[in-house]
Amino acid sequence: ELQQQGLVRHIGLSNVTVTQIAEAQKMVPVVCVQNMYNIVNRGDDALVDLLAQQGIAYVPFFPLGGFTPLQSSDLQAVADSLGATAMQVALAWLLQRSPNILLIPGTSSVAHLRQNLAAGELQLPPDALETLNTLVGRSLN
């Protein structure tokens, strides 16, 4: 109703499943989905791909969280080899994961903002991607 009244231009959804998105699409065009997703929490892998096929933006929340100590050490090793920070590598992985991923990382200072922006310039080579893709599900257990 709000969209029909001109009060809302576009509809985005958060914390939704494929089924819920399909249900919403029967009523309105969906332009963006925001769910938890990052280099180690990839439960939405198939959803990211589906949305990319449909031209729908995906905004991951918690893009830098959830690392175990083992994952963190492996992530840091990749970062060190690239002359980057671990967080830059994690953001770069998301940006390289799919063209429909849009990042809104938090920042606490101008220096932090510059570090976040530098992640967009970081190109992860195949060997780094291979290492990073093994982080999912790895823990100390």
Across the structure, where does each feature detected by a protein language model lie?
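Beta/alpha (TIM)-barrel catalytic core signal, keyed to glycine-rich beta->alpha loops juxtaposed to Asp/Glu
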Residues: E1-N141
